[in-house]
């Protein structure tokens, strides 16, 4: 085994591109005013879901060792969307808000009606799914939007954070 790959070895690989991915909804709450493909078409940035494993520390008479402890899902995942003139992303966020905390009354739908199941897929260069992550029990927790101004023509962007229960690599 060589310690450093040569150019011939490197040329044999088909490297995975960071622009080949897709977002789809396995299940969306009703009456959000948006479809899975409309969300996907406006989504321009995200990351791969992650987990972390806590450590257990074992200390005995001056010796310390570590072993894997509890593994936890990050619990939150962020997607960035371009807004269109039909205000579809703003309406989606507001529809979610109305389901989780209705204006002036604080009425909330049952949580089973609020949660979505989202699928984040990584694609090959031929746009064939090569791996996917299903996020279960997702709902809109927070969002942020582009600051409006008067000196540029930047497109309005929404950063939407979803809280989720867990994800599986499928």
Regions found by a protein language model. Name each.
Residues 1-170:
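Glycine-rich, low-complexity intrinsically disordered segments
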């Amino acid at each position: 085994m060589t310690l450093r790959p040569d150019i011939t070895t490197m040329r044999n690989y088909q490297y995975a591109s960071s622009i080949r991915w897709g977002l789809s909804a396995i299940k969306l709450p009703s009456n959000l005013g948006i479809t899975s493909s409309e969300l996907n078409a406006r989504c321009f940035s995200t990351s791969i879901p992650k987990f972390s494993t806590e450590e257990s520390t074992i200390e005995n008479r001056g010796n310390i060792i570590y072993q894997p402890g509890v593994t936890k899902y990050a619990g939150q995942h962020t997607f960035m969307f371009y807004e269109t003139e039909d205000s579809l992303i703003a309406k989606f966020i507001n529809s979610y808000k109305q389901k989780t905390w209705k204006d002036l009354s604080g009425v909330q739908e049952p949580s089973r009606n609020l949660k979505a199941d989202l699928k984040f897929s990584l694609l090959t260069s031929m746009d064939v799914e090569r791996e996917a992550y299903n996020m279960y029990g997702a709902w809109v927790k927070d969002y942020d939007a582009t600051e409006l101004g008067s000196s540029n023509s930047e497109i309005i962007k929404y950063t939407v954070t979803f809280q989720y229960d867990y994800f599986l690599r499928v």
